[in-house]
Curated annotation (Swiss-Prot):
GO MF terms, alphabetically ordered: GTP binding; ribosome binding
Assembly: Associates with the 50S ribosomal subunit.
Key words of the record: GTP-binding, Nucleotide-binding, Repeat, Ribosome biogenesis
Record lineage: Bacteria, Pseudomonadati, Thermodesulfobacteriota, Desulfuromonadia, Geobacterales
UniProt cross-references to PROSITE patterns, sorted A to Z: G_ENGA (PS51712)
Keyword Coiled coil: no
Disulfide cysteine pairs (residue numbers): none
Role played: GTPase that plays an essential role in the late steps of ribosome biogenesis.
Protein name as catalogued: GTPase Der
Residues noted as binding GTP 2 in the record, renumbered to the chain: 182-189, 229-233, 294-297
UniProt family annotation: Belongs to the TRAFAC class TrmE-Era-EngA-EngB-Septin-like GTPase superfamily. EngA (Der) GTPase family.
Protein's organism: Geotalea daltonii (strain DSM 22248 / JCM 15807 / FRC-32) (Geobacter daltonii)
Amino acid sequence: MKPLIAIVGRPNVGKSTLFNRLVGRRKAMVDDMPGVTRDRNYADVNRFDVPFILIDTGGFEPETSDRLLQQMREQSQLAMDEADLILFVMDGRDGLTPADVEVVEMLRRVNKPVFYVVNKIDGDRQENAAGDFYSLGIEQIFTISAEHNRGVNDLMEEVIAALPNKTAPAVDEEVTRIAVIGRPNVGKSTLVNRLLGVERVVANPTPGTTRDSIDTYFNCNKKRYLLIDTAGIRRKGKTTEKIEKYSVVDSLRSIERADVVLIVIDAEEGVTEQDTKIAGYAFEAGRGCIFVVNKWDAISKDNASMGIFVEKIRMEFKYLPFAPIVFVSAKTGQRLGKIMTEVDSVMEQFAKRISTSDLNRVFSKAVEEHHAPLYQGRRVKFYFATQVGTKPPSIVIFTNRPDGVHFSYERYIINRFRDAFGFTGTPMRLLFKGREGRKRG
């Protein structure tokens, strides 16, 4: 399990600038997929060959204008509760503020690494002006300019050295790992209890990697499954005071460890922006995805209602057209059996491997029927394709212009592979590599 680093601080101190600096320019295919939120406030980062999840808590601030100190308290509480390491950012141009001082006092009581960062220090003149911050009595303060990349590498070397070693517990590869994610009060807790209770599980709780986490094994139709962080789902499902926008943080750890993710949506409330944000991370993490529309029993409906709701999901989650949709009532148990049927189906596709000959038969025909657009006035040539991984299915395509393949053509190729081989419920990864040789089309 990857460690989680939270960036906290009052608005406009440069949290987002530091976040973007550390994330860098993402080259993943997802960047060009329609519907994926561009203003992400969480990301997978690899620094000095160490992977971690980075959270910009500034992105979780309420849109309405609340009191500044209240916002800072909420951000800091989030960091203290969820993160493995905290970067507390202050503004070197504004100087030390009373709000900064209060949060520092809160962070002194945290039993995890805290790094105190003074941003917007662009040169020696600003460095000298940052002396006020040393009055906090903190042993080490890092002065940086996130905008100009000054001091950032030195900071991150220390941060990486301080990260805890997050080793995930060994899990039987034959077990399908399921994460249940969604906004507060969509019925995750009831759904989990139903799944465990209906299947008459004899649970063997094992400690997970998250705080107070319990993973629960259960059996269904002679197969073994692992529900991730069931204690966390139950506990957090009862917490009403937690700000809704923070709920995405609760999902990150579970998604990282899952094979298949159940994205729970409230039928009464419909699809919200937060739903798309949480689902987007499951997609980017490359997990099998199933939409579970809960509370279907609680709404007035007619013969067209289900079709209308499906269209709404497909419109709002354009990057997940392959994900099955199940309509259930966790409260009554209606259609719950359909969930496990879909889990088995998605897991089979998630781990599917296609032979190179079959793959190239479909690929060659796709290229012949629809050539790639010209790149810098030259034709993009393709040589062959081969599957290099599963969970999710990952395919390398050799070409003379790996940078010249438009994202729309990537989608075309993926859709042709899906038409031929299925891959229902699972993302697919395409990687284009350069090679000279005999072309396929």
